[in-house]
Amino acid sequence: MMLPKSLTQGLLLAMLVGTAAMVQPYHLLSLLTSGQGALDRTALDGLLNTLVARVHCTDGPCEKCLSVETALALGKPDKPQLAPESVLESRYITYLSAAAALYLNDPEKTCKDIRAGLLASHVDDYLAKLESPEAMTLGLSQLLQKIEAHDASQPTREETCVDVPQLLEEAEEAGVSRSPGLVLTALLDHVLNGSCFQGLPSPQYFVDFVFRQLSSKPRNITLPELEDLMHHLGVGGEDHSDHGDHVDHSHLDREANHQDSELHATHNSSSSVWDTLCLSAKDVMAVYGLSEEAGVSPQAWAQLTPALVQQQLSEACSSSPIIHVQDQLSQAERYLYGSLATLLICLCAVFGLLLLTCAKCSTATHYIMQTFLSLAVGALTGDALLHLIPKVLGLHTHSGEVHSHEEESIGGQSTWRLLAVLGGFYIFFLFESFFNLLLPRDQDHEKDGPCSHGGHSHGISLQLSPSNLRQSKQPHESSRSDLVTEETPELLNPDTRRLRAELRMLPYLITLGDAVHNFADGLAVGAAFSSTWKTGLATSLAVFCHELPHELGDFAALLHAGLTVKRALLLNLASALTAFAGLYVALAVGVGEEGETWILAVATGLFLYVALCDMLPAMMNVRDQRPWLLFLLHNVGLLGGWTILLLLSLYEDSITF
């Protein structure tokens, strides 16, 4: 039976501000998942009062800067300048929960952000940073520890406190697993209900982890399993004597201890959520209730040893890459920088006009084009081999040590990721093969015999004649669809612009092929900026360098097909705009760290294909009256592209703004 909206709000308000009755859990989470109802001013005021009462700053009670008007303004994230509504709809409870989490984490800073009008943008950034599972676990653990520090009330020994696994489980039961909005809403429910929080695993968790790693069955550790454990830890030696009796006694002792540990096992200790959490020495001492002043006694050392073993076995601090928050971009910054980079790439299409406006300096244009061609080869191969492949394989480590067991764990997945690189290479091979099969064939080339290349195959050798901006005849050509053919009619001669029947489809095939290519480039740029701004910069540079000669070649090929300058420019620009579609798809989908890795793997295959199968043959097939000058320019571009990407790969961790 559907309750009236006013009655629903009244019941919700009673649950929020009632002091005598028991507060029911999950009321905000249920309201969010139902998509019905809203919070009025009275309900919000009671909610915020309860929230502020849970937080205590160093100088006493914290400022109540999170007002009702501020909360209602979160209901208009796209139009914050408009007057707030009288109620906060249920779908915006996610933003309210994120704002409350920021306030619980750092009340003073959040109040400054509210006064500066930055709360809405910081809420979006906070939700975006919790998207990946690793960031979710670490962020929630740190947040719960901050709540513990700011909470004046101390839980009793018998009280079971809320921890990270419980919040994730409640969010999964309510809707989507590991959704930041649902998890933070579940957290806000517990804050309002007066629950205590535990931001670190219990001591029993570390013992349970070791047993889970060694055996899936609830039994004692056997001698072979203990030997494997000691070998993994790098301790112990060869056993040259029979210790059967000793093993039997040890077996009995461990059985008794393990049965005792099973009695004290909790949900906190059995959850695998903590497996990827890297603990500091301060965290380990906090888990076992040890003060920094007193230090670790011999008795306490025996207690915390399982935590050290667990950290070694889980490789939480060695195999997991450290996330540098300063390198990550917020959602708004990803769209801004990604759009600017893609806009610069798309302007390459407009650059084709310079070929017409600077007809008298066509000699310089020819050599500039050849320099960019070699620079594109260097940038593409350099980005693929020096930056993208190490990132795809997880080799961009920020620690000084690389352990052998870490390399073994990466090995299997690395093979599949490298296979994705080959998949990207093969996909674009198939695309261009089918593209060439659909192209009309020139009758003159058919007379050359079965070994000749297709007549209008868009060969990559782009050689602009210094005399009248034409491409000269080449003995060899590759299959790149977005560069000029190797026929010799002059592009600017009006007599040669008569459309033959077999060329009518050529402009559209060129535009379609380039549109798909640019869409893939946009996906690569979007995934790169979703990772870090440094990866986005490197990928954008590589895409820009190879798009410049491509777009100029497209423009020349469209003119050769008989199109007017205006129409050729429009088609070239339209195909370039598909890069924005790929960019926004990659940014909007929110593929996460694992998805970004696979997209970058496929993009690596694309870069290698374009560089080695298209652009490198273009460099090798060019004939010029000044071969040594051309050789020098090719080397400058090739070595320059490699140098730029090498410096970026070596010193990217030292680059800060």
Swiss-Prot record:
A motif (Essential for SLC39A4 endocytosis) lies at residues 462-464. It comes from Rattus norvegicus. Expressed in duodenum, jejunum, and ileum. Residues 357-374, 439-508, 564-568, 619-627 are cytoplasmic. Selective transporter that mediates the uptake of Zn(2+). Plays an essential role for dietary zinc uptake from small intestine. The Zn(2+) uniporter activity is regulated by zinc availability. Also exhibits polyspecific binding and transport of Cu(2+), Cd(2+) and possibly Ni(2+) but at higher concentrations. Residues 1-22 form the signal peptide. Keywords: Cell membrane, Endosome, Glycoprotein, Ion transport, Membrane, Metal-binding, Signal, Transmembrane, Transmembrane helix, Transport, Ubl conjugation, Zinc, Zinc transport. Zn(2+) 1 binds at H517, D521, H546, H550. This is Zinc transporter ZIP4.
